[in-house]
Amino acid sequence: MTNIRKSHPLLKIINNAFIDLPTPSNISSWWNFGSLLGICLTLQILTGLFLAMHYTSDTATAFNSITHICRDVNYGWILRYAHANGASMFFICLYLHVGRGLYYGSYVYTETWNIGVILLFTVMATAFMGYVLPWGQMSFWGATVITNLLSAIPYIGTSLVEWIWGGFSVDKATLTRFFAFHFLLPFIISAMVTVHLLFLHETGSNNPTGIPSNTDMIPFHPYYTIKDILGLLLMITLLLTLVLFSPDMLGDPDNYLPANPLNTPPHIKPEWYFLFAYAILRSIPNKLGGVMALVISILILIIIPLLHTSKQRSMAFRPLSQCLFWLLVADLLTLTWIGGQPVEXPXXXXGQMASILYFSIIIILMPLTSLVENHLLKW
């Protein structure tokens, strides 16, 4: 008799995706982040759902409803901080997941990669709208500054911004629609994740060598389920340490002041996970140019498969490309740091240098280095 997990219409989908899935025998812990992202998404949806039961999306009561959640709701404080710091864990896993894809050439599977880039954009949009909901000073001014960037679009810019705001400034209508979208998008993300997995399972996973591993596959369960559980335990430990010991470490103290349209905070900045893009935006003195650089800094991931000039897929055996990759990582960390600094010398000039280096590495240096490596190997 056939096992029910292999014959049942629903169970066999789960079986083929998580149990009997043939997986390369040599994938490292860098392949853990996909499952960690799935767990992050589940955690965010669950904590968010319970927070939404007590939150009110009205300018008069939003800030107080957060206070009410933290003080009066049973374990409301842990829900709130698990949700806020869960977003940080989500982005740490996201950036490591994308970095792994860049290093090991996972972008060669273009459909999976492109859906992943769209997912990245959607998660960023969701996180931005979520940051507005507590209606603190940084929520309000962050929303004002970032939505105002759309006014740089020629001809339709101003109308577009007012349409998004639902008025002539960030107000009640803006908060209500941001809450609606923030609630809806994670479910759309879940559907997109399913498509992402569907395309991945069409080709199978890549592996650290970048060489096809069709002759050496092992079942996902129990080998990689147990390996993913180890990664999960480490992530949960880090998240709980943050939530229980320093829940506000990654937040902004200005967000403990209720939103006041008449008083601008001294330094308006987004959450840490957007600082690299914010630094690129600020490094260009022209508004439209800055907005374009901001969008292109992430959209550039779409063209990565076109810039792949190497005869080898992975960077595992390409020391020159490895040096450039780690230079790119260092550059992104520099941009993140500069994004949190005020716009004055030397931070402004260093941000411009880091922005130029970021685009140069991806568009010019990496493809050229790959060609040099091909030549050195006489390919």
Curated annotation (Swiss-Prot):
Keyword Transport: yes
Membrane topology: Multi-pass membrane protein
Binding positions (heme b b566): 97, 196
Annotated Gene Ontology cellular component terms: mitochondrial inner membrane; respiratory chain complex III
Cellular localization per UniProt: Mitochondrion inner membrane
GO MF annotation, one: metal ion binding
Record's cofactor remark: Binds 2 heme b groups non-covalently.
Name of one Pfam family that matches: Cytochrome_B
Membrane-spanning intervals of the chain: 33-53, 77-98, 113-133, 178-198, 226-246, 288-308, 320-340, 347-367
InterPro entries from the UniProt entry: Cyt_b/b6_C (IPR005798), Cyt_b/b6_C_sf (IPR036150), Cyt_b/b6_N (IPR005797), Cytb/b6-like_sf (IPR027387), Cytochrome_b (IPR030689), Cytochrome_b_C_euk/bac (IPR048260), Cytochrome_b_N_euk/bac (IPR048259), Di-haem_cyt_TM (IPR016174)
UniProt keyword terms in alphabetical order: Electron transport, Heme, Iron, Membrane, Metal-binding, Mitochondrion, Mitochondrion inner membrane, Respiratory chain, Transmembrane, Transmembrane helix, Transport, Ubiquinone
Domain of life of the source: Eukaryota
Binding site for heme b b562: 83, 182
Protein family: Belongs to the cytochrome b family.
More info: Heme 1 (or BL or b562) is low-potential and absorbs at about 562 nm, and heme 2 (or BH or b566) is high-potential and absorbs at about 566 nm.
Name this polypeptide is given: Cytochrome b
Organism: Myotis scotti
Name of encoding gene: MT-CYB
